[in-house]
C-alpha cells in the first residue's frame, strides 16, 4: 500500500492529491494513465486548502490529528470528518485540546498526549493492514 502523510501545508498537498487524483486513461504517457490516489492518507494539522466539501465512499482511509484551538486548521478538518461520516468512508479522528500548531512529532511538547500521538498513528496503520510485510 502507498499512503501519503502531510503536516500543515504538506497536509494541503496530500488533500489536493487524495481528493483530486486526475488520470487520463487515453494519455500517451503511461504515468498519466495511472490512478494517483493514495491507498490511505494521514493529515496532521493540515491547512485549509484542498479540503473538499464532500467525499465519496471510496475516499482514501484517513487518520486526522489536530488541535481544537488551532485557529487556521481545526474547523476545515472537522467538516471533512463529517463528510467522511456521511459517505461512510473510513476515518479516524484525534482532536486534542492543548498545545499549538506545528507540534511536529510531539518531542518538544510538554503534554503527554501530544508526545504520544505517533503511537496512535502506528496503531491505526497496524489496524488497517498498512504495516504488513
Model-derived regions, located:
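Acidic beta-to-alpha connecting loop that harbors the catalytic carboxylate
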Residues: 9, 68-71, 98-100
Amino acid at each position: 500500500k502507498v499512503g501519503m502523510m502531510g503536516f500543515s501545508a504538506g497536509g494541503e498537498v496530500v488533500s489536493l492529491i487524495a481528493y483530486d487524483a486526475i488520470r487520463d486513461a487515453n494519455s500517451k504517457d503511461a504515468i498519466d494513465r495511472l490512478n494517483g490516489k493514495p491507498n490511505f492518507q494521514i493529515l496532521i494539522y493540515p491547512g485549509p486548502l484542498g479540503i473538499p466539501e464532500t467525499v465519496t465512499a471510496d475516499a482514501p482511509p484517513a487518520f486526522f490529528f489536530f488541535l481544537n484551538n488551532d485557529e487556521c486548521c481545526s474547523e476545515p478538518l472537522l467538516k471533512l470528518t463529517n463528510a467522511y461520516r456521511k459517505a461512510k468512508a473510513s476515518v479516524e479522528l484525534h482532536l486534542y485540546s492543548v498545545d499549538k500548531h506545528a507540534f511536529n512529532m510531539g518531542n518538544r511538547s510538554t503534554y503527554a498526549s501530544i508526545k504520544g500521538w505517533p503511537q496512535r498513528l502506528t496503531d491505526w496503520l497496524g489496524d488497517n493492514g498498512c504495516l504488513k510485510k
